[in-house]
């Protein structure tokens, strides 16, 4: 039994940030019920190739990407645009502890599945909304993919080879780093909300935006700028503060030399 085995989570998320959060909760023991669209399911079910093979080694239509972030979950299909689907979600909410969703701002309000509506059914519900730009502000209504937010949030301005070198220019991370960090932040927020509920009996609405998380991820670069007034730039595989901390080509490939302090450097030389 995991630490969260006494909890039930409704997962109304798709793609990566939300599913990463709910998969973590499932790994910790929570019962996670994933609600998907009939006939389509989560977008990433179709993000292939590669596709998984069945027990006999035959290919399926299930993308490996989907399987990477949806283990340990139960999955049901509901059309939440219908009255019947909405009623079934409300029934599930009555017995749930946490709901996680990543619909565009205001979309669940149209279906009567927003926080205020569901709070009337389950007053101590913890309702976590994951969006590109948060619930308020000039960009709130915009959809936001990881790639877009990496650019807007400054990550691509410090990722990639230096501009003056061949191959220089903005690069996204090799994995969807903003989505993954956002999923982790959402998990932390939910765990904090559960602790708060245990002490007070109160539920709450958690507003998690990819852009907020991406800007927070820039902490050391932002502090360097605040201290010096010099905008951060791309350093390739080098470090903006310490040397040596980079990749070197050698006779049989590549090596990383990383010294985090003068003592390590003295031992190196």
Regions found by a protein language model. Give the residues of each.
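N-terminal helix-loop segment corresponding to the beta1-alpha1 unit
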Residues: 1-189, 193-202, 234
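Acidic, glycine-rich segments within the central catalytic cores of soluble metabolic enzymes
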Residues: 152-269
């Amino acid at each position: 039994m995991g630490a969260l085995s006494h909890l039930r989570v409704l997962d109304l998320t798709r793609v990566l940030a939300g599913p990463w959060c709910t998969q973590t909760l499932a790994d910790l023991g929570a019962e996670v019920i994933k609600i998907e669209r009939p006939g389509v399911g989560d977008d990433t079910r179709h993000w292939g190739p590669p596709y998984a093979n069945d027990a006999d080694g035959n290919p399926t239509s299930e993308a490996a990407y989907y399987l990477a972030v949806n283990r340990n979950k139960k999955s049901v299909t509901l059309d939440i645009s219908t009255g019947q689907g909405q009623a079934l979600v409300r029934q599930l909410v009555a017995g749930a502890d946490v709901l996680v969703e990543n619909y565009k701002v205001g979309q669940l309000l149209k279906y009567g599945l927003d926080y205020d509506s569901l709070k009337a059914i389950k007053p101590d519900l913890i309702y976590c909304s994951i969006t590109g730009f948060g619930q308020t502000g000039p960009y709130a209504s915009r959809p936001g993919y990881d790639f877009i937010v990496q650019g807007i949030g400054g990550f691509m301005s410090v990722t990639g080879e230096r501009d003056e070198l061949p191959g220089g220019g903005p690069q996204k991370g090799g994995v969807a780093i903003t989505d993954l960090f956002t999923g982790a932040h959402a998990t932390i927020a939910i765990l904090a909300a559960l602790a708060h509920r245990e002490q007070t009996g109160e539920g709450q609405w958690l507003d998690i935006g990819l852009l907020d998380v991406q800007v927070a991820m820039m902490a050391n670069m932002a502090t360097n700028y605040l201290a010096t007034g010099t905008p951060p730039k791309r350093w390739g595989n080098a470090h903006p503060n310490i040397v040596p901390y980079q990749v070197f080509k050698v006779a049989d490939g590549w090596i990383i030399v990383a010294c985090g302090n003068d003592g390590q450097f003295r031992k190196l030389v």
